[in-house]
Design a protein with these regions (language model features):
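Nucleic-acid endo/exonuclease domains
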Residues: 1-170
Length: 170
C-alpha cells in the first residue's frame, strides 16, 4: 500500500471526526442499519476494522459477495465538512484491505432532497444491484463509486480529486 501524499496514513476516523466536530455514531447510520435489518440485507463488517487490514480506517457497512465487496458509506450532508483527501484516501485504503477483490462503493447522503421513503427504496435497491453485479470489474482500478443524493458539483469535485490522487501513485 502506497501512502497518500498530504494525508497521514495513521489518521484515525475518530481523530478526523474530532477535528471536524462530527459525532462518533450518527443517527443516520443507525437508521440505515434498521433499514438493512428490515430488508434482510446482511453486512459482514460495520464500524470496525477489517481483519488483517493494513489500515486503521473502517467501513460504515461492508458486504462481501462472491467476487467483490460492496462498501456502503452513510455520508451525512455529502460529508462536505470532511477533508476530501481524507475521504478518498480512506476508500483507497479500504480497497487495499480486501485483497484481490473489486470494490463497489455506495456513498449515500441521507439529507438529499425528497422523501425518506424514496431515499430508502433507492438505497436498498442500489445495494441489491451492487451485490448482484460486480461493477468494479468494469473499471481499470477495480473500484467503482456510486453517489446517491449527492449534488453534481460535489461528485465532480470528488471524482477529479480521486483521479488526481491516483495519478500521483503512477
Amino acid at each position: 500500500m502506497k501512502p497518500t501524499p498530504g494525508v497521514p496514513s495513521t489518521y484515525l476516523c475518530a481523530t478526523c471526526r474530532d477535528e471536524y466536530g462530527v459525532s462518533s455514531r450518527k443517527k443516520w447510520e443507525e437508521q440505515t442499519e434498521i433499514w438493512l435489518n428490515e430488508s434482510g440485507l446482511l453486512w459482514s463488517y460495520c464500524n470496525k476494522k477489517l481483519p488483517c487490514a493494513p489500515t486503521t480506517r473502517y467501513p460504515d457497512y461492508m458486504f462481501v459477495a462472491r467476487e467483490h465487496c460492496v462498501l456502503l458509506e452513510v455520508d451525512e450532508q455529502e460529508h462536505e465538512r470532511y477533508n476530501p483527501k481524507c475521504e478518498i484516501a480512506r476508500i483507497s485504503e479500504l480497497m487495499d484491505s480486501i485483497d484481490f477483490k473489486s470494490l463497489h462503493v455506495i456513498r449515500y447522503n441521507p439529507h438529499a432532497p425528497g422523501s425518506t421513503a424514496d431515499r430508502k427504496a433507492t438505497l436498498l435497491q442500489a445495494i441489491r444491484d451492487a451485490l448482484a453485479t460486480n461493477f468494479g470489474v468494469l473499471n481499470e482500478s477495480g473500484c467503482v463509486v456510486q453517489y446517491q443524493g449527492y449534488s453534481q458539483d460535489r461528485i465532480v469535485q470528488l471524482d477529479a480529486l480521486s483521479c488526481a490522487m491516483q495519478d500521483q501513485h503512477k
